Every structure is written in structure tokens, then in C-alpha cells.
A protein has these predicted regions:
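Start-of-helix register in tetratricopeptide repeats
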Residues: 10, 44, 78-79, 112-116
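Short coil turns that delineate tetratricopeptide repeat
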Residues: 40, 74-75, 109
Length: 123
């Protein structure tokens, strides 16, 4: 069986995010789908999938993915919660976003996610 080294996984994740930045959302989705096969228990893939959906402007799909799949797999991911809150804000559903962002802002395991959530709460 083929194995993927951690540095190769990081490289593929970066390539997928570059594809997102270049509006190549289908290419990014394909890369992330393959990466998920090799790293099914790594939250960074779920975060990247969420970012890809949001970057494509599909905030509703991003929230549905986070709620229906990503947070079930990674319930303690403050970054997923912060991005969910951001997507809800973009859909003008700030009332729903506030508790999610407050929870993410309390994270001590992920200072970057906590900071992002705090900044979104101030906006």
C-alpha cells in the first residue's frame, strides 16, 4: 500500500490551498479528497475543505459540511468553529454565529483560532 509522509501531506495541503487562491475549486476539492484518504483523522484537511467552500462563496455548504461532517469528526476543533462562525456572519446570521465564535474564542489549544474568533466577535 502506498503511504504518504507527513511532509508530502503538508505539501499537498498547501497545493490545494493555492488552488483555492487561484479559484480552482474543483482541483482543490480533488486534492483534498485524496488527501483525506491518507489523513482521515487530521483536522487540517477538514479546515481546508471548509476554506475552499467559503472561498467559492458557498457559505451555506461550508456550514452544512462543518455541522454534518467536520465537527462530528473533530468536535474540539476551534478553527472549524471559527470558520463556521465566519460563514454564518457572511450569511448575515450573526445571532447564530455569536455562540459558536465565543466557544472558539475560549480555546486554549489553538491560539490562532481563538484570535480569529475574537476578531470576528469584534466585527
Amino acid at each position: 500500500m502506498f503511504d504518504l509522509k507527513p511532509e508530502e501531506a503538508r505539501l499537498l495541503l498547501n497545493i490545494a490551498l493555492m488552488a483555492v487562491g487561484g479559484n480552482r475549486f474543483r482541483s482543490a476539492a480533488k486534492i483534498l479528497a485524496v488527501l483525506e484518504l491518507f489523513r482521515p483523522n487530521h483536522p487540517s484537511v477538514a479546515v481546508a475543505k471548509t476554506v475552499a467552500l467559503m472561498s467559492a462563496g458557498d457559505f451555506e455548504a461550508a456550514v452544512a459540511y462543518v455541522d454534518g461532517e467536520a465537527l462530528r469528526k473533530f468536535p474540539d476543533s476551534a478553527m472549524l468553529k471559527a470558520f463556521k462562525g465566519m460563514a454564518l456572519i457572511r450569511m448575515e446570521r450573526k445571532t447564530e454565529a455569536l455562540p459558536v465564535l465565543r466557544e472558539a474564542a475560549r480555546s486554549t489549544d489553538d491560539p490562532a483560532a481563538a484570535k480569529m474568533a475574537e476578531d470576528l466577535l469584534k466585527s
